[in-house]
Amino acid sequence: MGSLETERKIVGWAATDSTGHLAPYTYSLRDTGPEDVFIKVISCGVCHTDIHQIKNDLGMSHYPMVPGHEVVGEVVEVGSDVTRFKVGDVVGVGVIVGSCKNCHPCKSEIEQYCNKKIWSYNDVYTDGKPTQGGFAESMVVHQKFVVRIPDGMSPEQAAPLLCAGLTVYSPLKHFGLKQSGLRGGILGLGGVGHMGVKIAKAMGHHVTVISSSDKKREEAMEHLGADEYLVSSDVESMQKAADQLDYIIDTVPVVHPLEPYLSLLKLDGKLILMGVINAPLQFVTPMVMLGRKSITGSFIGSMKETEEMLEFCKEKGVASMIEVIKMDYINTAFERLEKNDVRYRFVVDVAGSKLIH
């Protein structure tokens, strides 16, 4: 099928400088290529990474920038060589919309580790034009980087799974931590952390939430179903909990000591880092050596893992805790997210929003 029109003008909400303030912005989408899928956006999750990007925290931002990388929408048109999707399908798009296809990670179907991966926004596509994200009417994405949303899963529920859910699922799978009966720790109870509790519990793990204060105890235990709650500043409780956990998923995005958490791990336990921190973290080597422990990291997940994770969440009834907003609330939502004032993920109802004032 050919393209719907020669030049496709759409409206998104973009940041134009490092203040990070979003406002309506009109731009062009490329034609639907042979392997492209043209998607009308329904919902888009709001991730902490969006703030880093719109405010140029990583020093790599280009403006105007339309953020949003937890995108769920409906297929409006498919290219002539598209085999996996048809018009009317509900699909998802995550953090990546392109890769080189030739390197070891690409050939191993872990394209998120490709050194030439193309981000869904704040990047340059193969045609030389900037990529723009899901806080917009539509996107055009290569079929390789589109996933099917399972029947019966609502768009607003599916959106946060495409980043927060995947970020937790991928390392648990890769490091052989999916089997039931394991003891896991979740450090930090934000968007990724709350999905960590839910997914780990769905895998049959005994889950301990670790936090710097007692204020999220009821939330963790009563609402998210954690088995235990540990306050990291409570020395006695931390000592009692030593050598008990098979893994800890560390979602904290600011500098923090690692040694208190390394002490909680069993022999061969893994501390899996997921918070984006552009400053050195410290630990003393005996903490790792004497228990053959690992400090490792993980970055989102592959397209294959995304589809697996969505099916897993559907089968196990795993759902994100979300607050649905309209697009004109996005700047307030970012302010609240910076203060951790959300349970636990904002999702923009893009299709139900008036994008132009």
From Swiss-Prot:
It comes from the Eukaryota. InterPro entries: ADH-like_C, ADH-like_N, ADH_Zn_CS, CAD-like, GroES-like_sf, NAD(P)-bd_dom_sf, PKS_ER. NADP(+) binds at residues 49, 167, 188-193, 211-216, 251, 275, 298-300. CDD domains: CAD1. Zn(2+) 2 binds at C100, C103, C106, C114. It catalyses: (E)-cinnamyl alcohol + NADP(+) = (E)-cinnamaldehyde + NADPH + H(+); (E)-coniferol + NADP(+) = (E)-coniferaldehyde + NADPH + H(+); (E)-sinapyl alcohol + NADP(+) = (E)-sinapaldehyde + NADPH + H(+); (E)-4-coumaroyl alcohol + NADP(+) = (E)-4-coumaraldehyde + NADPH + H(+). Pathway: Aromatic compound metabolism; phenylpropanoid biosynthesis. Gene3D superfamilies: Medium-chain alcohol dehydrogenases, catalytic domain (3.90.180.10), NAD(P)-binding Rossmann-like Domain (3.40.50.720). One of its GO terms (molecular function) is zinc ion binding. Zn(2+) 1 binds at C47, H69, E70, C163. Its EC number is 1.1.1.195. It is an enzyme of class 1 (oxidoreductase). Binds 2 Zn(2+) ions per subunit. Belongs to the zinc-containing alcohol dehydrogenase family. Involved in lignin biosynthesis. Catalyzes the final step specific for the production of lignin monomers. Catalyzes the NADPH-dependent reduction of coniferaldehyde, 5-hydroxyconiferaldehyde, sinapaldehyde, 4-coumaraldehyde and caffeyl aldehyde to their respective alcohols. Homodimer. This is Probable cinnamyl alcohol dehydrogenase.
